[in-house]
């Protein structure tokens, strides 16, 4: 879509591209991010208060501010502020900007607990096309979603001449109607690397790391900081407090599509034993522009005689879901391997999004919603049982 499709808001130095994400591990903090064209007094401040209050309890936080240059582009001023000690299940208003350019939004930190219901939207490889707009519209039309798990590949700026950085701005405006009101949890994809030696841009992830506060460095061997970080993160998980263990990656480990076939294999070989050992419930991936859901399988037992390995059903293993079907500019990946392998439970070359409804510590309901004209159609669904509390076989 053209830049005119997602214009900046009216008003002098108006804040734009507003998005929020979780700011701490206990659910009482939120990172508020926004962009202004100028770095004037007050443009880096977020003011927030409880919606039901009389306004006398307003609090303000000053953001950290940065900008970056990329080839012939200079970004606006990128602001990130952490608001803390929020009350659970309480609606807050927050306000950005000054004077007549003030903009107001709201957010609600959820109640926490092992049996508290919570619904995630799941999107990957979104981009900013007509199909992308349909995906986001369909997700927002369902009132259930409380946060979005995003499996990488955001703006697709690198698919345009000289990695057109204005596409990052239009993308931020595009997702703002959702991302300003509920947390989007981002994973980085290959389109976030933005490495372009031919135009002198050799710092990987420059736009992404300036715009989004999440881990972004990729690892290619078993001795990197990323490897140690993941081991430490698994140790921190307390399944009595957070029963469901969900992992976001970008390149899928189980993929029966001809596109990007086995590109995640080296990562799978390294990390899959940890996922099985720690009883990961679900792994969401993007990268392949189609939809696929696996059986619970693992591929960690190698045949000593021939050196081959074969995925086998494993009730301690995650379900692997490829959700790179958001609608990006590169189109759908419509060539699957034939016959369909036994580890693949459902696959379809269509755009769409998913909902993961956590019901309690033992059960969750998962649905994939195919884009169809002006509505979303449930094309795949399954009741999931928690691997830690109820490692039993599931049924559709």
Swiss-Prot record:
Record's cofactor remark: Binds 1 Fe cation per subunit.
Transmembrane feature ranges: none
UniProt record, GO biological process: defense response to fungus; defense response to Gram-negative bacterium
Molecular-function GO term, any one: metal ion binding
Signal peptide range: 1-13
Localization per Swiss-Prot or TrEMBL: Secreted
Keywords: Glycoprotein, Hydrolase, Iron, Metal-binding, Secreted, Signal, Zinc
Top EC class of this enzyme: hydrolase
Gene3D superfamilies for the chain: 3.60.21.10, Purple acid phosphatase-like, N-terminal
Chain sites annotated for binding Zn(2+): 153, 190, 250, 287
Matching Pfam families: Metallophos, Metallophos_C, Pur_ac_phosph_N
Binding residues for Fe cation: 125, 153, 156, 289
Catalytic reaction annotation: a phosphate monoester + H2O = an alcohol + phosphate
List of catalytic residues: 260 (proton donor)
Binding sites annotated in the UniProt record for substrate: 190, 287-289
Subunit structure as annotated in this protein's UniProt entry: Homodimer.
Classification via PANTHER family: ACID PHOSPHATASE RELATED, PURPLE ACID PHOSPHATASE 11-RELATED
Similarity annotation: Belongs to the metallophosphoesterase superfamily. Purple acid phosphatase family.
Protein name: Purple acid phosphatase 5
Organism: Arabidopsis thaliana
Organism lineage string: Eukaryota, Viridiplantae, Streptophyta, Embryophyta, Tracheophyta
Gene name tied to this protein: PAP5
